[in-house]
Curated annotation (Swiss-Prot):
Record's keyword terms, sorted: Acetylation, ATP synthesis, CF(0), Hydrogen ion transport, Ion transport, Membrane, Mitochondrion, Mitochondrion inner membrane, Transport
Family (UniProt): Belongs to the ATPase e subunit family.
Induction comment: By UV light.
Top-level taxon of the source organism: Eukaryota
Species whose genome carries this gene: Cricetulus longicaudatus (Long-tailed dwarf hamster)
Name under which the protein is recorded: ATP synthase F(0) complex subunit e, mitochondrial
Amino acid sequence: MVPPVQVSPLIKLGRYSALVLGMAYGAKRYSYLKPRAEEERRVAAEEKKRLDELKRIERELAEGDTILK
């Protein structure tokens, strides 16, 4: 088996710094996007509720038309 390679402390520092910066960026981006996604879900739920109500009314009208004929 090949022995582990010695890595420069400067390279290790750079790698861990990039990791920490990426985690910080991800946390900041997530906190920015989360409220927007919640708003989109809320609007979509309201739209779905409105469409379901329209479909229900349309279905009731269609059933009412068949009874009268």
